[in-house]
Amino acid sequence: MPPESNSQAIIVLGMHRSGTSAFTGLLNLLGVDLGPKLMAASPDNQTGYWEHTEIVALHDRLLAALGSRWDDVSRLPEEWWLRPEVAPYREQIKAILSRDFGSSPLWALKDPRMCRLMPLWKMLIPEMGLSPVWVLVARHPYENIGSLDKRDQFSWQKSELLWLRHNLEAEYFSRDARRVVVTFDQFLADWAGAMERLRAAIGLPWPVPPEIAAEQAARYVDPGMRHHKAADISRLSAWSREVHAALLAGAEGHETDMQTGMDAVRHAADIADSLYEPMLRDRGGELEQQLAAESARFGEISDCLQEMRVKYAEAKEKLAARKAELDENKARLKAFERTPGAKLNRLLGAGA
């Protein structure tokens, strides 16, 4: 059944490696329902990802259907969420939410891919009678890029573009909705204060009161979660510095200042996208054709190699058969040489 009308959802947004996992893990300690099956922890994220496995897999399939993937820095197609082929994904998401959160008074979802896919979510959530609170978790771009470099070995430029793309889109598409902006610094320094801001936006008490969860939360929110610290920010582009400043303003409650700062960068980025994306896509198409040609050539070589293996196996089998035949003949000859007739022939030959 659909989530009850008084069901409250929290949607956690943020770039990959921005602290969204730590934030969502704390929601779990406060009793927020995260669903029945979550992505397992890994050496890169030992405290857990806290992501709904089915939702993440569905997001990946949707991005692939749109010709994209989670680490694609390009814009998605115009009004992609209105395409007929996207409708089945919307219905699948609604079915998952109804099944897993139908009776949950307070639940949350977190997947960085939602930053890119928010238009679809903003369409389907009202269809289910829900009014979520969106939480944008922001981390200093220098730290975020360093974390991506360690995990994925992305170039600085790609990581910075991903950081910009995710934050610009998450901020833009969460406008005109209940939202809270929290920086990773705020979360580490005062998790209780960050959660109180979110609780006030929700208008509901936490299922597990913070004073009860405090001891466990204090152990969970460890400053050691920060493996990368902002250092030489001169490496950052002006756009990243401006977006970071805007997010800091939003985290302090200055909504207008945040939107103004984000709009300035978004406008410039849109102009750059319109200039460079066609060229990059053409180049990408050329590379795909080259890859297809090389793949075909590799296939031909593989087929040839397989044919040679078959011929080699056949030759080896024939050689083994000939050797066996030769061994058999040698054995027969030795056996014959031991017979009386063979000995007599040798004696007669010697007498002659």
Which sequence ranges carry the predicted segments?
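Conserved phosphate-donor/acceptor-positioning beta-strand/loop module used by diverse small-molecule
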Residues: K110-M114, W121, M128-D149, W163, ...
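Short, well-ordered alpha-helical microsegments
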Residues: T20, C115-P119, W191
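A structural motif corresponding to the C-terminal end of an alpha-helix
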Residues: I96-P105, E169-V180
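Boundary detector for helix-to-coil junctions that initiate low-complexity/charged tails
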Residues: E252-A352
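Lumenal/extracellular "mature" regions of secretory-pathway glycan-modifying transferases
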Residues: K150-L162
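Glycine-rich phosphate-binding loop used to anchor ATP phosphates in small-molecule kinases
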Residues: W81, E85-M123
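PAPS-dependent sulfotransferase catalytic core
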Residues: M1-Y89
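The conserved 3'-phosphoadenosine-5'-phosphosulfate
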Residues: M39-Q46, L136-G146, R175-A246
